């Protein structure tokens, strides 16, 4: 959520910045409503002051045995006017807040301006793309012999986009998740296994709604609806909603391992079948609470974790600075880490590291007190560390052998009883 005071102070500048994300944004309706709301508040305060003064005079008149009927009638009239005014104020303020919460975060100055992902800028590439003496297979084709995934049986129970891991695939997935959590711990992150269901206001606080309302799985729990998390970012941000930190306790780094649930798996082409786009997947998520001055260092820390992991897994990857049209609603800046998938002959995102400034904390009312006792909204950052489906695919496709076997990355072998190769089962 944006600061209305800044919008009032520099409306043209704010609108220019916001239009980098959405060229259709106009702040005029917000500014007009804001003026009306402030006028109504002033009128309300004036009427309340008049009523209070008259009430004092009525009390004195009665104490002195004087007639106060005219003043009593005036108080009744003011009360009726005040009731109507406050109803109008409540309605207009609700409309104003609804418009405000639909505005995205401002992009940083160094973010490329483009309406779509074609404007993303590759800022770093690491590792040579693998060469094969044979035609490399898509992971779905590799699976025909490896038998580590199943797409048909879960389609019977849950529909398309809900794959199941089996046999050696289960062990590889858990090895990967355990390895990822250990890396987070090495880098100083507090580990969490948080709830998978959250209240609606927690989704609001992280910026998922109202803009993306209807895109999340909902569970009815009596009179309350709970939502399956699309990412652990939601619940980690929500842990400290309406709380006040002391500056000396910041920064705070969290990492959570959870399944993630998304209704839109995306339109999958022929190459994007299998694990590339799914409704449920496992992910280790990083999250940080910082002061504005600590945010850049936290951003570099998260990026370093991701690069450390991809380097140890010996996967070719690149970092892309996302354009304004490809960034998330909440982010002011995002760098994607993308791994090379030979089966798709393309790079695919496995991590997004985002700065969110005070956008989420204003919605969640998360603040900190500085050494002088002054209150500030906290800054938040998040990043995947990492999402496993495409990482799983990258391991299979980049390390495949001619006979259909897959060489297990060395760093994962200790979690698999020092097993070196996934062997075909046929």
Swiss-Prot record:
EC number: 6.1.1.11
Residues that hold L-serine according to the record: 231-233, 285, 384
Compartments reported by the entry: Cytoplasm
Pathway info: Aminoacyl-tRNA biosynthesis; selenocysteinyl-tRNA(Sec) biosynthesis; L-seryl-tRNA(Sec) from L-serine and tRNA(Sec): step 1/1
Reaction(s) the record says it catalyses: tRNA(Ser) + L-serine + ATP = L-seryl-tRNA(Ser) + AMP + diphosphate + H(+); tRNA(Sec) + L-serine + ATP = L-seryl-tRNA(Sec) + AMP + diphosphate + H(+)
MF-aspect GO terms: ATP binding; serine-tRNA ligase activity
Domain notes from UniProt: Consists of two distinct domains, a catalytic core and a N-terminal extension that is involved in tRNA binding.
Full protein name: Serine--tRNA ligase
Native source species: Chlamydia caviae (strain ATCC VR-813 / DSM 19441 / 03DC25 / GPIC)
Name of the encoding gene: serS
């Amino acid at each position: 959520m944006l600061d209305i005071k800044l919008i009032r102070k520099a409306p043209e500048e704010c609108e220019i910045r916001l239009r980098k994300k959405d060229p259709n944004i106009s702040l005029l309706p917000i500014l007009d409503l804001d003026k009306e709301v402030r006028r109504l508040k002033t009128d309300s305060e004036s009427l309340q002051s008049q009523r209070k003064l008259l009430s004092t005079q009525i009390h004195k008149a009665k104490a002195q045995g004087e007639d106060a009927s005219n003043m009593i009638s005036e108080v009744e009239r003011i009360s009726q006017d005040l009731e109507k005014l406050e109803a109008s104020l409540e309605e207009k303020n609700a409309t104003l807040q609804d418009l405000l919460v639909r505005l995205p975060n401002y992009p940083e100055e160094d973010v490329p301006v483009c309406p779509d992902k074609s404007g993303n800028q590759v800022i770093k590439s690491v590792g040579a793309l693998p060469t094969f003496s044979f035609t490399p297979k898509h992971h779905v084709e590799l699976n025909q012999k490896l038998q580590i995934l199943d797409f048909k049986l879960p389609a019977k129970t849950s529909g398309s986009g809900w794959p199941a891991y089996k046999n050696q695939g289960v062990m590889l997935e858990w090895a990967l998740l355990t390895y990822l959590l250990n890396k987070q711990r090495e880098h100083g992150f507090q580990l969490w296994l948080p709830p998978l269901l959250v209240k609606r206001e927690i989704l609001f606080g992280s910026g998922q709604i109202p803009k993306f309302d209807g895109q999340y799985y909902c569970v009815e729990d009596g009179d309350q609806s709970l939502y399956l998390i699309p990412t652990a970012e939601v619940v980690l941000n929500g842990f400290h909603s309406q709380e006040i930190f002391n500056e000396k306790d910041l920064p705070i780094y969290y990492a959570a391992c959870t399944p993630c649930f998304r209704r839109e798996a995306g339109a999958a082409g022929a190459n994007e079948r299998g694990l590339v786009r799914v409704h449920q997947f496992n992910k280790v998520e990083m999250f940080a609470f910082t002061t504005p001055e600590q945010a850049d260092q936290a951003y570099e820390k998260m990026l370093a974790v991701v690069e450390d992991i991809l380097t140890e897994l010996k996967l070719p990857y690149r970092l892309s600075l996302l354009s304004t049209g490809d960034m998330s609603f909440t982010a002011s800046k995002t760098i994607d880490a993308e791994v090379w998938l030979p089966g798709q002959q393309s790079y695919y995102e496995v991590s997004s590291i985002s700065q969110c400034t005070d956008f989420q904390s204003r919605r969640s009312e998360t603040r900190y007190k500085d050494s002088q006792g002054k209150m500030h909204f906290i800054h938040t950052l998040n990043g995947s560390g990492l999402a496993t489906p495409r990482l799983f695919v990258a391991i299979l496709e980049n390390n495949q052998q001619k006979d259909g076997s897959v060489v297990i990355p060395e760093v994962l072998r200790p979690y698999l009883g020092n097993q070196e190769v996934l062997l075909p089962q046929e």
